[in-house]
């Protein structure tokens, strides 16, 4: 049984919403997470996890994503879990850098089971705060996006849809993920110099082989048996900015599942927000994607 310890409660002078950091004991390890619960949250509200990138923190992705503001506006709970610290130096990271265990080559000697941890934490929060298990989702950036894909394959019983921002699908996850239909959102820049848009199946960067973005999307389209598609373009912010987004939505899949893909032309390794792209906010789009799942399945009644 997981044990919960309250570390500290941060409440700003002009806001009533609960903003807390806790410890959650799992597998003999005390794991940290930040929880944002808007004031007057309704029973059976949605729960969204937001996972940080490699070497980052839960507090950083919270500030960077500004998901609290979206949660306050639309009425859902946000959990920002903290990854564990690596036990040794590597060609990419220093000892002690935080990570989600998706099987990178640099983590070959790391054995933490983050799938089990995140599933257990989600179930605890569902019960503790009376949140709807049918409306529990996961999103993440970079390594957190990679982890979201792993959850999509191994934890779809808990996380009903996933969103990956600048993340990838490791080759080993792709090879082991069979007959699993789950809604997926991917947001990725074509000039991402960290998680390459075209992947790295030859493992030149020594992370471990991973698929290109479009191959990954094709995989999930096939998994969900989507029968239709829609394409749109989200325009420039200003004339000197060459970035824009091609939006592709694949619809009418198994259980009404949809695959949304935002291809950020000339985009980098970013959680895209205004003013980079006019009228586009990644956190808002993630919620819109999850809300679409809720609506299609009549879960908001």
Positions of predicted regions on the chain:
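A domain-start/cap signature at the N-terminus of enzymes
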Residues: 10-47, 59-74, 110-116, 133-165, ...
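Short beta-strand/loop motif that positions the catalytic acidic residue
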Residues: 186-188
């Amino acid at each position: 049984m997981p044990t919960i310890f309250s570390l500290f409660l941060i409440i700003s002078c002009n806001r009533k919403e609960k903003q807390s950091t806790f410890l959650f004991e799992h597998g003999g390890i005390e794991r940290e997470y930040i929880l944002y619960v808007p004031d007057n949250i309704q029973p059976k509200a949605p729960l969204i996890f937001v996972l940080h990138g490699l070497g980052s923190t839960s507090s950083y992705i919270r500030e960077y994503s500004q998901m609290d503001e979206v949660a306050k506006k639309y009425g859902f709970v946000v959990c920002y879990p903290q990854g564990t610290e690596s036990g040794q130096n590597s060609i990419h990271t220093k000892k002690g850098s935080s990570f989600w265990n998706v099987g990178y080559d640099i983590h070959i000697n790391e054995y933490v089971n983050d799938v089990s941890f995140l599933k257990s934490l989600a179930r605890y929060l569902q019960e503790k705060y009376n949140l709807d298990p049918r409306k529990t989702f996961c999103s993440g950036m970079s390594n957190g996006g990679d982890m979201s894909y792993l959850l999509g394959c191994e934890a779809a019983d808990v996380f009903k849809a996933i969103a990956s921002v600048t993340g990838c699908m490791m080759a080993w996850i792709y090879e082991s993920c069979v007959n699993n239909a789950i809604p997926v959102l991917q947001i990725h820049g074509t000039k991402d110099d960290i998680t390459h848009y075209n992947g790295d199946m030859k493992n030149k960067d020594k992370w471990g082989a991973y698929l290109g973005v479009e191959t990954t999307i094709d995989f999930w389209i096939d998994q969900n048996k989507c029968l239709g598609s829609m394409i749109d373009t989200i325009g420039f912010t200003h004339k000197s900015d060459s970035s824009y987004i091609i939006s592709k939505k694949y619809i009418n899949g198994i259980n009404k599942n949809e695959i949304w893909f935002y291809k950020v032309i000339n985009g980098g390794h970013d959680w895209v927000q205004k003013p980079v792209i006019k009228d586009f906010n990644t956190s808002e789009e993630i919620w819109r994607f999850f809300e679409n799942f809720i609506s299609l399945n009549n879960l908001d009644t």
